[in-house]
Amino acid sequence: SQADEPLRIGTTYMTMNNPFYSVIDEELRLVIESRGDILLTRDPALDQERQNEEIRDLLHEDIDLLVLNPVDYREIEPALREVQKAGVPVVVIDSQVSNPDLVACTIASDNYGAGVLCAEHLMNTCDSAKVVLIEHASTKSGMDRIQGFCDTLASHPDFQIIGRADSAGQLEVAMPQMDRLLEQGIVPDAVMCLNDPSALGAMAALQEHGLLEKTTV
């Protein structure tokens, strides 16, 4: 009977080039397949147009649920409207979308609060600092972390933002971006990165310039 058919669950994350999303997908797969259901995973590789197309393909695969981590929290909306029209519920993880009415629920950390904690830690360990930001401007989670950090430092003039660059949350992008800033003479006391891969990239660039031991990341 139709009731006995396995559920088909589609997932698409902003990139599988981040171990964080690989772990999430592996844990989902363990639970879903243990119930006899089917997980269909897609990787847009940080391309929102590609992610929108993947979602359309998943709809053609007759999925019953979409688990989503959007590449761009605004540009995902056309695909979400198609999913809503198809009557498929959406669970957003580790980020948000610009129109929450298009999803069933959102599961995310307090990213703004995480940024606040990073700023507080920096102020507790340093009397002053010139800071570089390594960002990911198209993701709400990344934006919120940086915003929480900046808002917390705003009333402390001894902590100044002297440069910023977008890494798309990727090690291989963060490294040359940090290198570019250093070559421009922008030498920070601290670097605030939105995630672990971008921090590793920034650290690699600082290491090449002999600055890692002098810089808080």
Where are these regions (language model features)?
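A short acidic, amphipathic alpha-helical/loop segment
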Residues: 27, 54, 75-82, 148, ...
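Flexible loop/hinge segments that line or gate small-molecule binding clefts
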Residues: 65, 69-113, 124, 139
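Short helix-capping segments at alpha-helix termini
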Residues: 33-35, 83-88, 152-160, 184-187, ...
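Periplasmic-binding protein-like
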Residues: 10-11, 63-70, 89-93, 132-133, ...
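Immediate post-signal peptide segment of exported/extracytoplasmic ligand-binding proteins
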Residues: 1-9, 33, 126-127, 189
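Hinge/beta->alpha junction and helix N-cap segments in small-molecule ligand-binding domains
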Residues: 12-26, 41-50, 72, 106-117, ...
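Short, well-structured alpha-helical segments in soluble
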Residues: 49-63, 172-187
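A short, Lys/Arg-enriched amphipathic alpha-helix followed by its capping loop at the start of a domain
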Residues: 24-37
